Curated annotation (Swiss-Prot):
<keyword id="KW-0535">Nitrogen fixation</keyword>
<comment type="similarity">
    <text>Belongs to the NifQ family.</text>
</comment>
<keyword id="KW-0500">Molybdenum</keyword>
<keyword id="KW-0614">Plasmid</keyword>
<dbReference type="GO" id="GO:0009399">
    <property type="term" value="P:nitrogen fixation"/>
</dbReference>
<protein>
    <recommendedName>
        <fullName>Protein NifQ</fullName>
    </recommendedName>
</protein>
<comment type="function">
    <text>Probably involved in molybdenum processing.</text>
</comment>
């Protein structure tokens, strides 16, 4: 599934510096 994580996380794609984005979680 896709989990909403903080953009600062290395798992996240390029996105806003302070907002959240969706990234695949293992």
């Amino acid at each position: 599934r896709w989990a909403e994580i903080v953009c600062r996380s290395p798992s996240c794609n390029e996105c806003c510096e302070w907002h959240t984005c969706f990234a695949p979680e293992d």
